[in-house]
């Protein structure tokens, strides 16, 4: 299959990691699909993505990935079928290295087998992380390898490359065939993290575009400090470098709704994928209002995929920069962000 429009605009959906980390199961994913179908689908959200720690710690005797039998006792395909029955798309996670960041089997040297497995299960989206990557193989080769495998698996699968902005990813990622690429470390649910990631994009506005979008990481809108991911402070290989500080996470604390609104608007005008990270089963009215703002989403989903303009000016009495992002569209209409 070859959907020539796959990745035309940034994907919109939900990912399990920010709130649930490894605490995922069949019931949770089905409930998330129910919530998206009833509360978010009409706004354009369509992907339900399972992140790390969904599999057993070992492959089977044939080298195939095996779903965790406690978390997904019926396997993955029935979950994917349920998501599809809601008119949504289903996503999963793997890693370019020998293991995932959580210590489960990675896809290194299993790329084509795993791509076929994902296709058999009905996967529509693959997040592909960067932990435990062999030092002797450039990331560019590993992402091209999985991209080739996905393009030959018999199913259209959105390919999300997640190497945290390492290895000059801007220079080669489009040629790899990835539909989106992470250009930052992991976001955390606090204003300092949001601000740091947003400011890190100054000068990088030109790199994303149709069919290869600059991913500034998932949204934390609506989390309000509700997360299970303190474990990332672990010093396991590959894990301790993915927090946005490059070291360990700052203490989680949540944001105000105004800060979340700013966060959502910034991610939208910078054409980042809009992948929700909160518990969408329990959104507050304010959270839903932010995440379904049709004017903000229209900017993000504009098929021209124009990047924002960054305006910097020395105009403060304390001699520091004022930084502003603006986004121009073909027609002049006021939008409340």
Residue ranges and their predicted role:
Residues 1-12, 17:
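Mature N-terminal, pre-catalytic/accessory segment of carbohydrate-active enzymes
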Residues 11-16, 46-50, 90-93, 124-129, ...:
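Structural recognition of the beta-strand scaffold that forms the well-ordered cores
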Residues 89-103, 152-168:
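Aromatic-lined carbohydrate-recognition surfaces of secreted/lumenal glycan-active proteins
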Residues 110, 158-279:
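Glycan-recognition surfaces
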């Amino acid at each position: 299959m070859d959907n020539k429009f796959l990745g035309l605009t940034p994907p919109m959906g939900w990912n399990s990691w920010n709130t649930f980390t490894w605490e995922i199961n069949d019931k949770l994913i089905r409930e998330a699909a129910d919530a998206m179908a009833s509360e978010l689908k009409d706004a354009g959200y369509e992907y339900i993505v399972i992140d790390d720690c969904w599999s057993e710690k070992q492959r089977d005797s044939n080298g195939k990935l095996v779903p965790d039998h406690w978390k997904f006792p019926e396997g993955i395909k029935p979950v994917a079928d349920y998501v599809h029955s809601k008119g949504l798309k289903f996503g999963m996670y793997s890693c370019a290295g020998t293991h995932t960041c959580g210590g489960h089997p990675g896809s290194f040297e299993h790329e084509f087998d795993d791509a076929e497995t994902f296709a058999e299960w009905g996967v529509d989206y693959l997040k592909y992380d960067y932990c435990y990557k062999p030092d002797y193989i450039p990331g560019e080769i590993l992402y091209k390898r999985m991209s080739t495998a996905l393009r030959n698996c018999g199913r259209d699968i959105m390919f999300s490359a997640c190497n945290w902005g390492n290895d000059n990813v801007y220079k080669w990622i489009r040629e790899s065939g990835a539909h989106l690429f992470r250009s930052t470390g992991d976001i955390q649910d606090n204003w300092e993290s949001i601000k740091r990631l947003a400011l890190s994009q100054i000068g990088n506005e030109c790199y994303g575009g149709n069919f290869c979008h600059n991913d500034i990481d998932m949204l934390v809108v609506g989390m309000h400090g509700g997360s299970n991911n303190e474990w990332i402070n672990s010093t396991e290989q590959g894990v301790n470098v993915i927090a946005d500080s490059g070291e360990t996470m700052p203490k989680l604390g949540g944001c105000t709704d105004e800060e979340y609104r700013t966060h959502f608007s910034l991610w939208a005008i910078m054409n980042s994928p809009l992948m929700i990270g909160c518990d969408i089963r329990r959104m507050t009215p304010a959270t839903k209002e932010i995440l379904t703002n049709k004017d903000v989403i229209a900017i993000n989903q504009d098929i021209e995929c124009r990047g924002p303009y960054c305006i910097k000016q020395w105009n403060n009495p304390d001699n520091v920069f004022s930084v502003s992002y603006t986004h121009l569209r073909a027609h002049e209409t006021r939008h409340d962000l």
